[in-house]
């Protein structure tokens, strides 16, 4: 019965087809909301007719009666196609969920799937996984599956997802097909995806001089079509999980200027001084491993603007990406504390060597390898393990509970 239940929830136990690009994510409070979204169009099932939206049935796992949730749909960006849009993005949004509760849902007559709302208190250990720089490769699929096999509450990916560069819609769709296949955890639960932005989400990669937020959003059409519900404003995002975890999702100069976010970072770190586990995440590293400290202006700016603010705060650690290898450094501490920086993004891409002399002096761990960070939070402390492609442990750091 246990095996049958797993097959059913992973889409192998009954007729019908789960959308090939099914993504669960959050646009609001992770403890009480959930968003499911998927694409319809060529190769992905018929686009919904006007007035005939897809219907989702859902219920708590233990409940006897199913409820009905109506979906909404919008055109999905299709930059290479002149004329009719080929794909449509369909969404189902749940509100007022119970924290730390499992729910079943069924899209049309497709197999039943399961999700879990986030707990609002840290009464038992919580795991999430983290990485960046993925691409659409066999190694990318392997690394995402490895992350999901850890049975995490969610996966956070800090930019450079599909390498679609804001224009290659076919590549973008292939990436989400790959994620959808990987996203079923060992117990049949679909793992939510928390996305950060990198240069390969944006046409041109970085903020254009004089461009407005609205103009830059248009240069990252897929990212904002999928995740604009979370990134609504011209500022970073703070994703809060009850009273125990906060993720500060920054933009390292891709749509938002770096300097425009410094005051936000300072204020939001101050607001979360009582939160035991606070992580900041962005794409371009403050402490590169393949590039040098002055290789590009964004590296210099995030190090000059944000590192002193973080060193003067109670932040637990920082996740960086962009340089395609595993490197952990401790910041120099001139702003107050030495902060661990976990980088630098290799969740499927071809790993690069460590050749930054400035960062090597601060380096605590390095591997020219793909990796995924597995973060376990407990009442008495936290552990971050970095796993290589075969699940081998490449690095491990133990954190005592924040005493503040």
Spans of model-derived segments:
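Acidic, histidine-bearing metal-coordination/catalytic regions of metal-dependent phosphoesterases
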Residues: 14-130, 149, 368, 374-404
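Active-site glycine-centered loops adjacent to acidic/histidine catalytic or metal-binding residues
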Residues: 133, 159-160, 198-199, 250, ...
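Bacterial N-terminal signal peptides
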Residues: 1-11
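Residue-level marker for buried hydrophobic side chains located in beta-strands
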Residues: 128-130, 155-157, 195-196, 280, ...
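Acidic/histidine-rich helix-loop elements
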Residues: 49, 65-89, 125-140, 165-166, ...
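Mobile, glycine- and charge-enriched loop segments
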Residues: 119-135, 261-300, 394
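Extended active-site neighborhood of metal-dependent phosphoesterases/phosphodiesterases
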Residues: 88-93, 99-116, 171-277, 293-297, ...
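An acidic-aromatic substrate-binding cleft motif
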Residues: 110-165, 169
